[in-house]
Amino acid sequence: MNLELKEKKIPKKEVLNKLKRLDKRIQIKYPVFKNLREKGYIVKTALKFGADFRVYDKGKKPGKTHAKWIVFCDHESKRLSWSDFSAKNRVAHSTRKKLLLAIVDEESDVSYYEVSWIKT
């Protein structure tokens, strides 16, 4: 991958370094963003919710409907404490979205885990 800026090619490594200065988690978030977009989902920021993304179901329009998922991205090597897991669940519940945990491995492959509430 190269980026062209005013007809000047910028190597992939340099692009990544520039992006890392803007967002230290870009190597975790970008594979998730790319994967969801390739699957046809609309992906928007969820910064105001303290999450990485909000995702709209295929064919749904942001502004006309609510996002289906709120997404938190992490690397497979990162441990998730019960209090962090609970906090993520509270954010999803309070925003009326399903919680989607996106776990990125060493090869930048993404696994998703959807968390839903069960009424008993």
Question: What kind of region is each of these model predictions?
Answer:
Residues 1-33, 42, 59-120:
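Conserved phosphate-interacting/catalytic interface
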Residues 50-58:
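Beta-rich nucleic-acid/ligand-interaction surfaces
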Residues 39-50:
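Short, well-structured beta-strand/strand-turn elements
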